[in-house]
């Protein structure tokens, strides 16, 4: 059977449009007991399929991905399902077209008004579309979907924007790499694009939104971007693909998928396995040294992949992106747009369960919306206003209350706790009141017995209570603030002069949602009390490290020099 589904001389793989057809709106058939009835609503077609005059679409299915829905098959048995007449030119005369199982509307892919499936092994090899099967394929033929696209298609905005990357306007001959504008046109055959190959698919890396966090009053310094090594953590990234094949390629973002040093250490560790696979040499150039692809450990891979690797920014040429990605590439945010972006290459796993990415994205958005609403409801306008005013600079860190009129060394005085809070102080230190002196005499002898045995001990009259207003006036508290970069020894000595001090949070009990303030206070208290021991342990660790490095260097220098065959001299 000749190849079908060509448009402009380009064969379509995995999905083909083969013919135009019409259907009567009242044309239905009764759904009988089916051995294979998958749920194909999430089977997304490229947008060019919705613009072609050919309405009949054929797509290869995978039984381990598009599994049989036994519950739906039993429920819809006996229901009326839309159907259409298959054109005689689609299959040979000996094709068992009567074994097609037409599907209910709710189980059809988006944009289809009718469609059916041939189960695994139903179609013989000579009846299966050659565009959708490899020549070296062995075993029974995979299932096949044959559907009739609707005339008027209305897709959701999110799906429509996702399909925009496949839009190919008529008459557009320039294939421009979207991240690096260029005026050069390339006349090479566009069949080199990975999206048009039968063994590749192009994915979109979708990073799930991170949990909402309040803006920190302590701004971190700007980290200089580097391109020497690139190992991102992709465990929270979903790879959205129009159809699932063995190998998929996706452009990554250095902004949304930054380099993670812990992932780099994991790739160099011998204790953790990094699954590998052979990259096709006809697609990817041989990159060695710093430009070689880095294979990631299993725990840092996206869901549904058995092995994956990443090319760091600048390792692949711009010409490779233009010829291999072409018009199907989606622009991604990058820290440096003067070099080519990083690239993800993954091998899809056929053993694991299929991941419903659209449903997972929806659930994640619902979860983040609830968390955001809860966090925003717990904030007050004053808190948000204070954070917005002091987000760029922070002066204080810890406020100490003492009886001394002057602040200790390394601190500055403030008038009130409100002023300390506005300066950024989050913790306070106060002096604990001394407990009342208790009577240590034997509880078995009461006061009357003491007075009878020791008449010289007369009870002293209780002192008259002093005026509280006068006491507050005489003992005015002094508030001193320490900065975030203050000397910890000076801070500890000032706190030690209070004799008995209490460390607590300033203001609310939990001013920073999502942070264990009790644990943070315990760690700060431990640092203040045991700073000498911590320094000593750190010094011992550094000395041991230096000793091991010097020992390894000496052992390396003692190794005999091995000469190669070219250095050997025969006398």
From Swiss-Prot:
Keywords: Repeat. Residues 457-471 have a biased composition (Acidic residues). Transmembrane segments: none annotated. Residues 440-472 are annotated as: Disordered. Coiled coil: none annotated. It comes from the Eukaryota. Belongs to the DM7 family. This is DM7 family protein CG15332. It comes from Drosophila melanogaster (Fruit fly). The lineage of its organism: Eukaryota, Metazoa, Ecdysozoa, Arthropoda, Hexapoda.
